């Protein structure tokens, strides 16, 4: 069975877990969101490379307009330093693992569609309220990214 390390990056905390390919959470933890890009990547790389389990990849759930294909983040979010660098290149080089990344609201919606309250639903509207506010739209079982990767985002809002 394949295992993955998944990071859910938020404006306040980064939650991470070792997850099996069937969605079972093997273990989980969190740490405070770093204040700069160097610490951001250092935390992810150290936790990945020091993992006891054999990993098949890294999954990143990130705020902003996440370009899953090119490995970058546009737009704005509670963590302004994450916009610009190529996450896939940096993390693959440092860990020798495949990296997948997606917008955090899209990840939450996909998780609920896979194993949660929206299981077996084809059309979903999902709202996330945390340090920021975001949303996701799943239409006919697929994430609607929109022309500029803002398909489910109804505004740029940061909450206190």
Spans of model-derived segments:
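Generic beta-strand structural signal
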Residues: 9, 66-68, 129, 138
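Glycine-rich phosphate-binding loop and adjoining helix at the ATP-binding site
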Residues: 34, 38-45, 54-58, 67-123
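Hydrophobic "anchor" residues
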Residues: 25, 73, 143-144
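Conserved phosphate-binding loops in N-terminal lobes of ATP-dependent enzymes
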Residues: 4-62, 69
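A generic "binding-loop/recognition-motif" signal
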Residues: 12, 105-106, 150
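Short, hydrophobic/aromatic-rich segments at coil-to-beta transitions
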Residues: 1-5, 123
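Small-residue (primarily alanine) positions within well-ordered alpha-helices
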Residues: 6, 59, 109, 135-136
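Glycine/GP-enriched mid-protein hinge/lid loop-to-helix segment characteristic of carbohydrate kinases
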Residues: 17-21, 30, 37, 100-102, ...
């Amino acid at each position: 069975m394949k295992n993955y390390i998944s990071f859910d990056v938020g404006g306040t905390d980064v939650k991470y877990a070792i997850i099996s390919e069937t969605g079972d959470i093997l273990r989980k933890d969190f740490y405070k969101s770093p204040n700069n890009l160097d610490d951001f990547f250092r935390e992810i790389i150290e936790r990945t490379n020091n993992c006891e389990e054999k990993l098949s990849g890294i999954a990143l759930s990130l705020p902003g307009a996440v370009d899953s294909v090119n490995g970058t983040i546009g737009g704005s979010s509670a963590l302004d330093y994450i916009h610009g660098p190529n996450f896939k290149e940096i993390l693959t080089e440092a860990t020798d693992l495949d990296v997948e990344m997606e917008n955090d609201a899209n990840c939450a919606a996909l998780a609920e569609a896979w194993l949660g309250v929206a299981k077996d639903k084809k059309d979903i509207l999902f709202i996330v309220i945390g340090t920021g506010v975001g949303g996701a739209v799943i239409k006919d079982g697929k994430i609607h990214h929109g022309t500029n990767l803002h398909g489910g985002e109804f505004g740029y809002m940061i909450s206190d």
